[in-house]
Amino acid sequence: MPEQGPRMNGFSLGELCWLFCCPPCPSRIAAKLAFLPPEPTYTVLPPEQQQEAGAASGAATPTGSGTCSLHLSERADWQYSQRELDAVEVFFSRTARDNRLGCMFVRCAPTGRYTLLFSHGNAVDLGQMCSFYIGLGSRINCNVFSYDYSGYGVSTGKPSEKNLYADIDAAWQALRTRYGVSPENIILYGQSIGTVPTVDLASRYECAAVILHSPLMSGLRVAFPDTRKTYCFDAFPSIDKISKVTSPVLVIHGTEDEVIDFSHGLAMYERCPRAVEPLWVEGAGHNDIELYAQYLERLKQFISHELPNS
């Protein structure tokens, strides 16, 4: 990174040159601004490797299951028992850009109609999110399907804007084909950077609903709040895609968000053709909305009473 100097909207002149000139293309800007993959907090063992591991340790391993197994590290902060962990299904899919995609299906609401296709934030992976998915799904009566972006967790490749879109396409297809979940029973849920692939997919496919948690208008508008239009070198132009989303959209944003200003959520809400009553969480920042009681209350109201449940 360049040395520090005079700053503009949180960026020094040197940082701006580094950001936009090395090289000047949206995908590189996107990677520098948005992607912070953590050290993986989990591993996934295919069936054949489970057999090998069991033989090496002398432990018995189940035969004939043909399923991958999930192994969490201490940094995953697992909050449940082995029983819940055993109910979490993990597997690999493949994207159109030929990256291996780590996928997770959390069956926490067997009687629920809807499944969330959850696109997480930029500094976590499936291992860190697993406990949250179980808690969220069981409280709002939804199963949860999620995936790690290219370059995150066990997913191969490098994080990029193009890979984001290919990743969620592969996740969408896996949820539909592997689990037989139809579009009218899928709720697309995006959080922070996860709203980018969510909006892109929702602008191309109709689904039961869309939830945008701390969304951004575009990458350039995050770095430069006074930006009023989308330039050719901008990244993540969700603000230009949201008008094409025909499904009901719930926007959630904290009024004191220090990462993606509240104005982003408001602008996205105003552009939605089928926006429902939003949730503006007074005093909440970027990473603590889930701690406020109205978060779960609004989700329950939206899913149980504002969407069809028969």
From Swiss-Prot:
GO terms for biological process: regulation of postsynapse organization. One of its GO terms (cellular component) is dendritic spine. It catalyses: S-hexadecanoyl-L-cysteinyl-[protein] + H2O = L-cysteinyl-[protein] + hexadecanoate + H(+). One of its GO terms (molecular function) is palmitoyl-(protein) hydrolase activity. Keywords: Cell membrane, Cell projection, Endosome, Hydrolase, Lipoprotein, Membrane, Palmitate, Postsynaptic cell membrane, Synapse. Its main location: membrane. Its EC number is 3.1.2.22. It is a lipid-anchor. Palmitoylated on cysteine residues located in a cysteine cluster at the N-terminus which promotes membrane localization. The active site is at residues 192, 257, 286. It is found in: Recycling endosome membrane; Cell projection, Dendritic spine; Postsynaptic density membrane. Hydrolyzes fatty acids from S-acylated cysteine residues in proteins. Has depalmitoylating activity towards NRAS. Belongs to the AB hydrolase superfamily. ABHD17 family. This is Alpha/beta hydrolase domain-containing protein 17C. It comes from Gallus gallus.
